[in-house]
């Protein structure tokens, strides 16, 4: 296996040359590649329709638990101060209160329709984050609906518990912060930042249908929360110092201000997601984009089959994360390789995200892997346009592949293993 372990050395060399400026450039490239500006616009429109239903459902859940009933007003205040710029939250809070009061008077059928609207927002978020993580297979729809309905019902309780804990911590810490100038104010400003960081990190960790490293999720969540707070201050400064919208729209200025704020907020959420997703693939970007490594996927597929073949002998199951670590590949690269192998019936996913090889290595030739990942002449014969010379060339290439790559994987990896040392004679 020495032949295949050496291929990771160029990758390890590249990992040492990570520069923050290059990483931010990579993040911005991915941000626009995933059309995050258009997705933020779609989420803004869906949020406008879903915000009141989500608030109504959340408050009804809170009302069902007397222990958190006293936090109902504080939850609304927390949502407004977090989601709405200070210059506009007074007017919007009045409208939100009226909408929530009207929604509370609806029947069970009416609330169910509101729930559908709220779930539509969550499904849109689900698709957006999975697209950023380049996930090709989403969770089953019923599974996703159950998860997000649980979030709608349990989320308000968690917010209430967080506010209760925050209130207790602030009361308990006054003895420590009393002697620190501005200590209480600093604690008040840090609490929303911490709660927002936790919310973003949990979303980046749970929503993508992929195993996300918790360090990457936290990094993206903290970055998004810090950017969110900075943007909130900047937006409030712009609205108060440059009242362009008030001058143009008059009393209706709250509407475009709120829409613009929602759009910028979703841009920040998506940027944090791109940062979290980029951390897993950035280390291997230069090696993967090397023009001299266009056949690298074929070589990586051989290495992956070698690992699964050894696991098959030992009766073990390899997870996607262990494959990434052993091959030093990004999650996207491993997933693309496994998808093609599943279609070729080389491997299969078992319970709990494990992967096993279902075809005997003696039955898989190197030519089979080459045709799957590099070049399949038979598939291009119809594009020759009837040119007999090109058709003959493709036939010759196919014959050459079969002749030069007829070795089965069982013999390839056996021959690659180092021979045991000879015994010393007495």
Curated annotation (Swiss-Prot):
Pfam families: Virul_fac_BrkB (PF03631). It is a multi-pass membrane protein. It comes from Nitrosospira multiformis (strain ATCC 25196 / NCIMB 11849 / C 71). The keyword Cell inner membrane applies. InterPro entries: UPF0761_bac (IPR023679), Virul_fac_BrkB (IPR017039). The chain crosses the membrane at residues 48-68, 106-126, 145-165, 187-207, 217-237, 255-275. Keywords: Cell inner membrane, Cell membrane, Membrane, Transmembrane, Transmembrane helix. It is found in: Cell inner membrane. The keyword Transmembrane helix applies. One of its GO terms (cellular component) is plasma membrane. Belongs to the UPF0761 family. It comes from the Bacteria. This is UPF0761 membrane protein Nmul_A0452.
